Every structure is written in C-alpha cells, then in structure tokens.
Amino acid sequence: WYSSMFAANIKQEPISHHNHHHHHHHGHHQHQQRHNSNSNASSPHQSPLPNLQLEQYLKQQQQQPLMWSGLPNPMQTIMPANMRPSPTAATAATTTELCAPTTTVAAIAMQANDKLQALTPPMDVTPPKSPAKSQQSCAEPEKEHDLMSNSSEDMKYMA
C-alpha cells in the first residue's frame, strides 16, 4: 500500500511539470493572438476591432504574469510571429509601445524588431504601404484560422 502511495507521489512530479508546460503552450497561443491583432492594428482607421483585441490581450497579459517569469522564452515565441509580417513588424512594435501598460512587452517587441531588421534589411526597406495593405487583406482569414487551430490545440492539450 505504501509503495503505491509513493508511486502516486512520484507520478505527480511529471504532472506538475506538464502543467507548467501547458502554461507555456498557452503563452505561445497568446503571442499568436498578439501577432494577429497587431497585423490588423497596423491600419486602425479601417476597423476599430483590432484595438479591442489588443485591449483584451493586454488584460489577459496582466492576469497571466507567469508568461514573463521566463523572459527568453517569450522572446523566442515572439520572433517568428514578428518575422511573418515583416513590413508591419515596425508598426507592431510602436503600437505595442503606445498601448501597452507593461513596458516589458514593448521592450521585448523592440528587441525582436532590432534583430528582425538586422536579419532582413531588404524587406524592411521596401515601401511599407502596399505590403501592409496586402497583409491586411489576407490577415483576416489567416487570423480566423490561427485562432481556431490554436484553440483546438489547447483543447487537445487539456483533454
């Protein structure tokens, strides 16, 4: 009987680790959301919705201080997210800086943006107007898809 108790205790170790891992996954999910709302917010005059999304995201952000406990990880998660829409990356960084009450977010976005500029200078130099518009048009379905695939992943994770 005792041995089974100990086995249960030992089994709980990886479970708690798994929980932490799940939070990590959730953090990644939130970064996806942020990337999406930012690519939309690059032209806020088109629709007021992105600002709402950003506000929602920031509220979630404050509820989950867990994400910032490991700073290097959000950095890694944020890099690919910013890499995809590189024309809007600069706008994303400034948007975050203006709206975010947490300066950490802005700092991380800025760092990522610096790295991004160093990695892909030609793409940043290209006139940002037309790519931003095309980005806007294809960002809508992509946003839906991203959010849906992410939430299903989360569900799988929790089940």
From Swiss-Prot:
Disordered: annotated span: 18-49, 119-159
Basic and acidic residues: compositionally biased ranges: 140-159
Biased composition (Basic residues): 18-34
Keyword entries, A-Z: Developmental protein, DNA-binding, Gap protein, Metal-binding, Nucleus, Repeat, Zinc, Zinc-finger
Gene Ontology molecular function: DNA binding; zinc ion binding
Protein's GO biological process: segmentation
A GO CC term assigned to this protein in UniProt: nucleus
Compartments (UniProt record): Nucleus
Family membership noted in the UniProt record: Belongs to the hunchback C2H2-type zinc-finger protein family.
Described purpose of this protein according to its UniProt entry: Gap class segmentation protein that controls development of head structures.
Designated name of the protein: Protein hunchback
Protein encoded by which gene: hb
